[in-house]
């Protein structure tokens, strides 16, 4: 049915009176109520709001994927102008018609790449499939275009990445693959649902720049869903603010940032962490407290002086972790990924040490090596005076209750067949620390501590938003009262208000229980707030390490300074010229078998502040 007379000539998408409902155990739950929006060619509309506000549900409705989640569009109109200028009503299209529309005319980058990529196909085959389907290219042409797209999203060793599987890539790498796949067919409308959540600030800056360039080339309309107000200020033309399933405010990016009218918008902006807010303070501090009824903020003056002097709870000495890459007729190991190269550090009780760096720098691998989820090539890991890198699985089991983890991808961490209450209770049952009513009460308490309701224990992971799933993972990590928590991007999927609540919770638990955190993150504003010390990683090596104040206020290494310069500012009037932050020749940590990485030498430049000495033949010297 033609609808061209109902869509403005400049619009590529129009949504009017959209209402979406979920059906659960015979009950109807309204997730989105009366949402309307318009998107013009070449325009970027950002949708912001708390986790569970209906942002992602709205996007899934536009892709006609909402039915797979047990929801339906109750009423409303969704008009799309295809690349051939034909205007269609999305809700009237059959499944076969939508398969032709998705990817070619409207594409989506999802928040959790591991659940969006097929684990049994290589990266190259998955990107090439979309190109073959919508562009009619041959297999060879599609693979060549897939490599070009990987180059565009700045994945090093793109030819090698084509033959690798999703589980062999870091979270940030997987997200870049998703972005390459979505942009490969140059759609008329791109929906990006938290596309840079898993990316470090430098790659985030490059990806945002790439989307802008492609948007201008193709006059592509972009709907950008995010909780990062710095990103909103950087890329948005207009902003739609959602709260509890409704659009509460819309306007230009300047109007929203400089003259917000709705109390929720004012509260949302006030809660944004600002890089530099900790200048002059040496110890971690809680985020400002937000009242739901009063946008004014109250900043706690309590500093987190929790570090216990004496012996470190965790010691790492000369850790090396490498992964083999096989190729050739006989599938022999010909190259290796030098993921972690000769790193050493200590972690004291009650301390937060943050690992920062780009995707693929070795941060997550370091955390997994400490948990013995991957085996290290060499080095020592000493926990509470006991060497654990040589322990058998049986002897390691009792120690696991003292070292817990929060992973980057919450959906992959939760069993989809079990209720979240069962998943939280499982560590208690395994370690014999509770069962029956006592365990149920513990689960209810943990859910409340992370901002969820006790009755959520009976729901399944797919019934929660990405941010809510991450809170469930945090509750599970806290169940055993651990001495050390390794948090791998633990708050990256959370909106700003919930992020502040979770960081405050982690700080409270650290003060009450003396927990030590190894905090892996690319969010420099959060790292600045929570850290006692910071270690900067690049290509598997630590290039700068020291007290948080010294590293942030006086960064010595060129790479550290580039990380700081890439952080987006949550103010559209303060755009900083952000050039491409890394050279076009991206160094790679993939080496021939037997080839050794030159070790960096750390120099003491201040109290506890160490910086890598550049080497002539080292990638660090080319930064």
From Swiss-Prot:
What PANTHER family does UniProt report for this protein, alphabetically? GLUTATHIONE IMPORT ATP-BINDING PROTEIN GSIA, TRANSPORT ATP-BINDING PROTEIN
CDD domains (UniProt xref): ABC_NikE_OppD_transporters
The biological process GO terms on file are:
peptide transport; transmembrane transport
Q: Where in the cell is it found?
A: Cell inner membrane
The family database entries (InterPro entries) matched by this protein are listed as: AAA+_ATPase, ABC_transp_ATP-bind, ABC_transporter-like_ATP-bd, ABC_transporter-like_CS, Oligopep_ABC_C, P-loop_NTPase
Please identify the protein, giving its name as recorded: Glutathione import ATP-binding protein GsiA
* Species, as recorded: Salmonella typhi
Gene Ontology molecular function terms on file: ATP binding; ATP hydrolysis activity
Reaction(s) the record says it catalyses:
glutathione(out) + ATP + H2O = glutathione(in) + ADP + phosphate + H(+)
**What is the membrane topology listed in the Swiss-Prot or TrEMBL record?**
Peripheral membrane protein
Reply yes or no: does the keyword Lipoprotein apply. Answer: no
> Which positions fall inside the ABC transporter domain?
15-269, 325-564
**Family annotation (SMART domains):** AAA
Listed under subunit, the entry gives:
The complex is composed of two ATP-binding proteins (GsiA), two transmembrane proteins (GsiC and GsiD) and a solute-binding protein (GsiB).
Quote the EC number: 7.4.2.10
Q: What does this protein do?
A: Part of the ABC transporter complex GsiABCD involved in glutathione import. Responsible for energy coupling to the transport system.
């Amino acid at each position: 049915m033609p609808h061209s007379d109902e869509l403005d000539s400049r619009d590529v998408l129009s949504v009017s009176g959209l209402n979406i409902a979920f059906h659960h155990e015979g009950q109807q739950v309204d997730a989105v109520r009366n949402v309307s929006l318009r998107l013009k060619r070449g325009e970027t509309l950002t949708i912001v709001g708390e986790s569970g506000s209906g942002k992602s549900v709205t996007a899934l409705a536009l892709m006609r994927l909402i039915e797979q989640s047990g929801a339906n569009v109750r009423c409303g109109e969704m008009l799309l102008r295809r690349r051939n200028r034909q205007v269609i009503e999305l809700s009237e299209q059959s499944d076969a018609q939508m398969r032709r529309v998705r990817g070619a005319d409207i594409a989506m980058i999802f928040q959790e790449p591991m659940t969006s990529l097929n684990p049994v196909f290589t990266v190259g085959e998955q990107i090439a499939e979309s190109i073959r389907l919508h562009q009619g290219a041959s297999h060879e042409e599609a693979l060549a275009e897939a490599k070009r797209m990987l180059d565009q999203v700045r994945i090093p060793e793109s030819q090698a990445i084509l033959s690798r599987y999703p589980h062999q890539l870091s979270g940030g790498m997987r997200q870049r693959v998703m972005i390459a796949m979505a942009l490969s067919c140059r759609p008329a409308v791109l929906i990006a649902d938290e596309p840079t959540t898993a990316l470090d600030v430098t790659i985030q800056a490059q990806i945002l720049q790439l989307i802008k360039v492609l948007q201008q080339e193709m006059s592509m309309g972009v709907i950008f869903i995010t909780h990062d107000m710095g990103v909103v200020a950087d890329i948005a033309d207009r902003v739609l603010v959602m709260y509890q399933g409704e659009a509460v405010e819309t306007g230009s990016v300047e109007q929203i940032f400089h003259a917000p009218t709705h109390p929720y918008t004012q509260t949302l902006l006030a809660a944004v962490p600002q890089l530099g807010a900790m200048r002059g303070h040496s110890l971690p501090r809680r985020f400002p407290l937000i009242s739901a009824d009063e946008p004014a903020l109250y900043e706690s003056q309590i500093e987190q002086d929790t570090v216990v002097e004496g012996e470190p709870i965790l010691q790492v000495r000369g850790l090396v972790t490498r992964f083999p890459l096989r190729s050739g007729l006989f599938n022999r190991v010909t190259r290796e990924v030098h993921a972690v190269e000769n790193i050493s550090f200590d972690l004291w009780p009650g301390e937060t040490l943050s690992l920062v760096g780009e995707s693929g720098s070795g941060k997550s691998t370091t955390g997994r090596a400490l948990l013995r989820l991957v085996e290290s090539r060499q080095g020592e890991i000493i926990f509470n005076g006991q060497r654990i890198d040589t322990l058998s699985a049986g002897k390691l089991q009792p120690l696991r209750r003292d070292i817990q983890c929060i992973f980057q991808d919450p959906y992959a961490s939760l069993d989809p067949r079990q209720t979240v209450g069962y998943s939280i209770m499982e560590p208690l049952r395994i370690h014999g620390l509770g069962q029956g009513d006592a365990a149920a009460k513990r689960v209810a308490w943990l859910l409340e501590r992370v901002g969820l309701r006790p009755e959520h224990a009976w729901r399944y992971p797919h019934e929660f938003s990405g941010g809510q799933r991450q809170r469930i993972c945090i509750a599970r990590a806290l169940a055993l009262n651990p001495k050390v928590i390794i948090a791998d991007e633990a708050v990256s999927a959370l909106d700003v208000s919930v992020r502040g609540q979770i960081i405050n919770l982690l700080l409270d638990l650290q003060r009450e229980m003396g927990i030590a955190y190894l905090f892996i993150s690319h969010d420099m504003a959060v790292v600045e707030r929570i850290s006692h010390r910071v270690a900067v990683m690049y290509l598997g090596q630590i290039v700068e390490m020291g007290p948080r104040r010294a590293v942030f206020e006086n960064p010595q290494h060129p790479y550290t300074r580039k990380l700081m310069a890439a952080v987006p500012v949550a103010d559209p009037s303060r755009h900083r010229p952000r050039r491409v932050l890394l050279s076009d020749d991206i160094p790679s940590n993939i080496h021939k078998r037997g080839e050794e990485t030159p070790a960096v030498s750390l120099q003491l430049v201040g109290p506890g502040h160490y910086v890598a000495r550049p080497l002539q033949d080292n990638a660090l010297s080319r930064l």
